[in-house]
From Swiss-Prot:
Disulfide pairings: C64-C67
Record's protein name: Thioredoxin domain-containing protein 12
EC top class named in words: oxidoreductase
One Pfam match: Thioredoxin_7
Organism from which the protein derives: Rattus norvegicus
CDD domains, per database record: ERp19
The gene coding this protein: Txndc12
Alphabetically ordered keywords of this record: Disulfide bond, Endoplasmic reticulum, Glycoprotein, Oxidoreductase, Redox-active center, Signal
Function: Protein-disulfide reductase of the endoplasmic reticulum that promotes disulfide bond formation in client proteins through its thiol-disulfide oxidase activity.
Taxonomic lineage: Eukaryota, Metazoa, Chordata, Craniata, Vertebrata
Annotated localization: Endoplasmic reticulum lumen
Length: 170
């Protein structure tokens, strides 16, 4: 009886330890949703160049309260999930953040969401229109992210983007 009780306690403790040590950050999703096809920045730039899709880049820190608050809203949004198929999705956490100042156009606050054209160039004109004007790339809700994704789609895909892009090269 005591051997059975000891085994049950050990099994229960192991299960409890497994549950409490998991923070939902498996894979490249890092809490933003493993159902989304995330890439590294390097792989994402290659894929965007080959596919012609724009990139959406999330920059966040594991210790950041605002980042932790955005994660479940982002991960649970079916609209973000659906729109993500029209982007190369890149998720950068902690030391993965690029040192290039293009990735912090108005400061190094977090989280930041930036949109890049298919050539890998940050497009600073795509901002959170309904957010704080001092923090243009800071999103606090799934609705704001969806709005940004839709704006990026309009500006970075299709004929409007190609016309503008080719004019810039001339």
């Amino acid at each position: 009886m005591s051997l059975r009780f000891g085994a049950t306690c050990l099994l229960s403790f192991s299960f409890l330890l497994l549950i409490t040590s998991s923070d939902g950050r498996t894979g490249l999703g890092k809490g933003f949703g493993d159902h989304i096809h995330w890439r590294t920045l390097e792989d994402g730039k290659k894929e965007a160049a080959a596919s012609g899709l724009p990139l959406m880049v999330i920059i966040h820190k594991s210790w950041c309260g605002a980042c932790k608050a955005l994660k479940p809203k982002f991960a649970e949004s079916t609209e973000i999930s659906e729109l993500s198929h029209n982007f190369v999705m890149v998720n950068l956490e902690d030391e993965e953040e690029p040192r290039d100042e293009d990735f912090s156009p108005d400061g190094g606050y977090i989280p930041r969401i930036l949109f890049l054209d298919p050539s890998g160039k940050v497009r600073p004109e795509i901002i959170n229109e309904s957010g704080n004007p001092s923090y243009k790339y800071f999103y606090v809700s799934a609705e704001q992210v969806v709005q940004g994704m839709k704006e990026a789609q309009v500006r970075l895909t299709g004929d409007a983007f190609r016309e503008k892009h080719f004019q810039d090269e001339l």
